[in-house]
Amino acid sequence: MAAIDIQVSLRGRYRGHVPINVLDPLRQCALEIGQAVVEHRGRGYSGVRDTQYHLDLAADEVALRVLGGAEFRVVSEESGVSGAGEYTVVVDPIDGSTNCDRGVPFFATSLAVMRGDELVAGLVMNQATGSSFEAEKGAGATRDGQSIVPSGQTEVGKSIMAFSGLPPRHLGWAQYRALGAASLEICLVADGSLDVYGVAQHSTLNPWDYLAGLLILREAGGVATDYRGEVLDTSSAVVRRPVFCATPELLDRMVSVGAI
């Protein structure tokens, strides 16, 4: 879909305060990013900024072009704030850049749409497989067009947990993972592949890493809290926050036994 077509659709039909086709430019953006990074994988760091890869710059260039053409304001991990518009897209062009550059097949494009301080839509595409998680506020969550729900696991001792960083201790899990792409790991909690995802204590995530995934998680029936077990605030496109994700029952159980 051309950028001009997307502009017209966003100015047209609405569901509440959300354009009917708000996910269309996000899909186009993710697909074009996937195509763009192929030739840059394995090139290493860009030298522009610490831990920034050549593939990050290539992906960001695509994101700014596609999203700017759709008249979004953009908040990107790679280039900061650009453009203007009623809707803001918070984007991590490639979440899991090291995985992508080194050939580990677990990395994603994360795109969250905000209207003011309200999170209204999100898309996370696994660029290694092409699988796509999507949600609009109040409309449920899907993976490749099929509705998703969390695992329903309620026992800490039977849970498969994933973390960003090293947990302070064994938290009673059955199995543990560290996969390296937060947005995608949150989505795997949303569809029941994982039971829990969290950051190590005293760590936080940037909003481009968690906003899209958290909307998908919530629309699927999961919850996200901070370390105190309080519901996570998703009203800011720039504030880093601690994140813990699971089903409501499992998070309550983890808090009660001191696992978080």
Region spans (language model):
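DPxDG-like acidic metal-binding loop motif
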Residues: 85-138
